[in-house]
Amino acid sequence: MSLYYEPDPANENDPPLLPPILTPIPVVKDVDVFAKAIAVAGKSETGTVLYSENPEYVEVAIILSPEVPKIKCNQMLYILMVAAGDAIGALAPPEVAVTYAFPGFIFLNRGEAGFVKIEVAPSTDDKSIPDWMVVGLKLRLNNNIEICEHEINADITSLADEGGG
């Protein structure tokens, strides 16, 4: 039995059900979640998860407290890319190819679907341990971009376009 079992589907207005070490904080639709997380990182608890209430995107930013020097913190970018790919793989059909490109782009069947970002607290030395770090993900759920009929942009896709939503 799991601690996180839900007998009924979650209500759309309920906050996400996360492990106790993580604290979800909603961010209104038109605010940049990553920028907000950076702004509050110095005074927030480790494990604070800011998420957008915008239904068009999965947009999250997680505030962390690194235990390694600043130069090694960049490894979290790749960890978040792979974690996002694993989550997409659980939702999308098996024939959907999930690929990545530096610096943090996520592609579904060669179409750009999202990206991951990282920001580390400013410090003077790459060998010092930063006070905080923010990792963020933005993934397009629906492709509701207004497109002129003569300008089809096949380079942009979404989870729904690829059969995963």
Show which residues each predicted segment covers.
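Polybasic, glycine- and aromatic-enriched phosphate-binding surface used to engage nucleic acids
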Residues: 62-64
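N-terminal, Lys/Arg- and Ser/Thr-rich interaction peptides
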Residues: 45-59
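A generic structural motif
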Residues: 59-60, 138
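Catalytic palm active-site di-aspartate
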Residues: 98-110
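Long, positively charged amphipathic alpha-helical accessory segments at protein N-termini or as interdomain linkers
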Residues: 2-46, 66-93, 111-165
